[in-house]
Amino acid sequence: MTEVKAELVGSVWKITSKPGDQVAEDDVLLILESMKMEISVTAPRAGTVKEIRVKETDVVKEGQVLVILE
């Protein structure tokens, strides 16, 4: 399993995947908003989305686990 973590502090603007989705490396999993910029969080490898640990509008901190891939 792979943990996809936030690289910065921000809020979850849009979730673009759901548990069970098959994703390829670099597919966008969700979009964070930080300092009026949109930052795409992408899959580090191909796999299946097992769990999404945040919801839209959540505030996340650097290093927080956002998505679990298997």
Q: What function would you assign to each model-found segment?
A:
Residues M1-S11, V28-P44:
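Short beta-strand-turn/beta-hairpin segments enriched in glycine/proline and small hydrophobics
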Residues E3-E7, K50, L66:
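Short, basic/polar N-terminal leader/transit segment immediately after the initiator methionine
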Residues A6-V9, A46, V54, E62:
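ATP/adenylate-binding site constellation spanning eukaryotic-like Ser/Thr protein kinases
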Residues L8, K14-K18, Q22, E51-V54:
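Short histidine-centered loop motifs in beta-beta connectors
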Residues K14, I31, P44-R53, V65:
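Secondary-structure boundary/capping motif
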Residues G20, M37, T57:
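Surface-exposed, flexible loop/turn segments at secondary-structure boundaries
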Residues A24-I39, K61-E70:
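Short hydrophobic beta/alpha edge segments that flank linear recognition/processing sites
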